């Protein structure tokens, strides 16, 4: 609790002043990526990389960025690939000339955090989960899709941290911003960012509307936590709340229901086969995702893809066998 109070004091001090790289996509040609801007509320924007260039994210290169603009300075959610920082800054400058003061990370992966150091060097204060900082400070582990993690750079590490039971509330630019930690879901250090007045929640990668769920168990993610995070999202969101995933199009609360039901359906089938003594290979051969493959965009991705059906089912099997 002491660390939480210190974190809150640092945040408040920084706010007072403001008022007075998942691993880089293999084979990605960053020179071909454009940063696209979508206005989602009066002073809230979503920045996205253009589609079809990043092999790891065909729908849009890298992760989504949130930008809250106003006289108190720019508040950013996530930082994209480091190679795209200049393009991201150029897109922000078309929105506002105010300094970039705050940056919060939804989770560990380099497509959301690799640009951290660049923005910190511009003067941004970096906030994230204590668990995320711990993950980023450890020697790199490969992510669950086999990509190497980005090399550790101390400048990428959060300065202000908060724990699972210590949500942070910021007030700036006429908005109330809630940093809401969730249990180990996509990774072990996930955060949802809610903009109360705009009725927008940025939910990171524990939901995606392209491919099957990607739960990075190498970096603390868990199937149980992902389901809990989806439940938490449905509790927080109203019928008109805009939910911004780390990848894919903006959704609403109703879109979470079939996604969660799909996970529960696959989980139940895999659990049944485990009880029958089936091996992982036998479960994969049974094609337990077949009822969903035609409904999930990208549901028929090749087996090697990070969000393919086979990788998802393998993760579910391993989590259930491990009792998690």
Model-predicted regions and their roles:
Residues 73-75, 81-83, 169, 176, ...:
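Metallo-beta-lactamase
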Residues 12, 21-25, 235-240, 249-324:
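Accessory terminal helices/loops
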Residues 50-51, 79-80, 108, 124, ...:
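Active-site metal-binding loops of divalent metal-dependent hydrolases
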Residues 1, 5-9:
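N-terminal export leaders
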Residues 8-18:
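Bacterial N-terminal signal peptides
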Residues 48-63, 136-144, 148-150, 210-223:
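Acidic/histidine-rich helix-loop elements
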Residues 39-92, 191-195, 199-203:
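Conserved beta-strand hairpin/beta-sheet module of binuclear metal-dependent hydrolase folds
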Residues 44, 90-171, 188:
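Active-site HxH/HxHxD metal-binding segment of metal-dependent hydrolases
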């Amino acid at each position: 609790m002491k660390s939480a109070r210190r974190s809150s004091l640092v945040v408040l001090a920084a706010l007072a002043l403001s008022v007075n790289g998942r691993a880089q996509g293999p084979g990605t040609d960053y020179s071909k990526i454009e940063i696209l801007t979508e206005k989602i509320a009066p002073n809230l924007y979503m920045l996205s990389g253009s589609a079809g260039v990043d092999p790891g994210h065909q729908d849009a290169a890298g992760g989504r960025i949130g930008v809250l603009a106003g006289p108190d300075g720019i508040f950013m959610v996530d930082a994209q690939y480091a190679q795209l920082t200049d393009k991201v800054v150029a897109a922000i400058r078309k929105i506002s000339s105010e300094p970039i003061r705050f940056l919060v990370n939804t989770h560990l992966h380099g497509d959301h955090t690799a640009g951290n150091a660049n923005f910190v060097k511009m003067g941004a204060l970096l906030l994230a989960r204590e668990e995320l900082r711990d993950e980023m400070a450890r020697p790199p582990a490969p992510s669950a899709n086999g990509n190497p993690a980005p090399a550790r750079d101390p400048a990428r590490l959060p300065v202000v941290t908060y724990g699972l039971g210590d949500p942070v509330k910021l007030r700036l630019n006429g908005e109330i911003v809630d940093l809401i930690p969730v249990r180990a879901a996509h990774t072990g250090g996930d955060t949802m960012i809610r903009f109360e007045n705009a009725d927008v929640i940025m939910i990171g990668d524990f939901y995606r509307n392209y491919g099957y769920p990607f739960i990075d168990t190498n970096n603390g993610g868990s199937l149980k936590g992902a389901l809990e995070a989806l439940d938490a999202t449905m509790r927080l969101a109203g019928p008109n709340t805009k939910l911004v995933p780390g990848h894919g199009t903006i959704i609403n609360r109703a879109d979470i229901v079939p996604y969660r039901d799909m996970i529960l359906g696959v989980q139940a089938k895999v659990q049944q086969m485990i009880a029958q003594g089936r091996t992982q290979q036998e479960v994969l051969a049974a094609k337990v995702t077949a009822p969903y493959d035609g409904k999930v965009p990208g549901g028929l991705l090749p087996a090697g893809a990070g969000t393919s059906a086979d990788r998802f089912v393998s993760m579910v099997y391993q989590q259930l066998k491990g009792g998690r």
